[in-house]
Every structure is written in C-alpha cells, then in structure tokens.
Amino acid sequence: MLIHFDAMETTLIPHMRGGEKEVSAQMYSDSLGKIMRGRLIPGASIGLHTHETSSEVIYILSGAGKVLCDGMYEPLAAGSCHYCPKGHEHSLINDSQEDLCFFAVVPEQ
C-alpha cells in the first residue's frame, strides 16, 4: 500500500494528548495502527501518554527537540529515532526555535 502524505489533507490537532499548542499532521490509520507525518511549531508538544496497546517509533525529519520517556529526557535532532515500547510513556516536545517535523508509526499489538 502506498501512502502519499503530500496528497493528504493536513489536520490541526490542538493540545494533542494534553500537550501545548497544536500538531499539524497528515495521518493514515486503520485497525492495525497509525502512520503520521507531523509538525510541531516552537513551544508545541504532544502530551505525556502511555502506550497501553501499541508501541511507537518517531523519526525526526528536521528540526530539534526532546522526548520525555519514562521520566528521562532524551535530545532529538534530524536523523534521530525514538522508540516507545508497549506499556511505556512518552511526550514529544519542541523546545527549539524552529519547526520539528517527524514521521511516526504506531502499530497496535
């Protein structure tokens, strides 16, 4: 299956998972999971949440920020990848002065 993000409508998600500001995203989802290309403007975040029935992989396309995973902060930059296993919690934070663009896959398990 081909997923063409540039052909998808951009959705603005305010305060995603209780985070700051909004996430702009193109997203594909079905019963097996979600695939998303997203953007966080400076100061925006995806709030802290636990992956009860899924895991998540986030690959940073451009920009920089940090992730809070199980109480520990990890820096993120273009080319880095974050993995949150099933049963763990995390939050994606753009604490930089530029947009943070990412690709995320959330497979149900």
Positions of PLM-derived features:
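Short beta-strand segments in beta-sandwich/barrel cores
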Residues: 45-46, 63-68
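Short acidic-glycine-tyrosine-enriched beta hairpin
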Residues: 72-86
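Structural motif
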Residues: 64-66, 73, 89, 99
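A short, N-terminal "cap"/entry segment at the start of jelly-roll beta-barrel domains
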Residues: 1-34, 47
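Conserved short histidine dyad/triad with adjacent acidic residue
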Residues: 36-51
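Glycine- and acidic-residue-biased ligand/ion/polar-headgroup-sensing regions
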Residues: 53-65
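Ligand-binding loop in jelly-roll beta-barrel domains
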Residues: 86-109
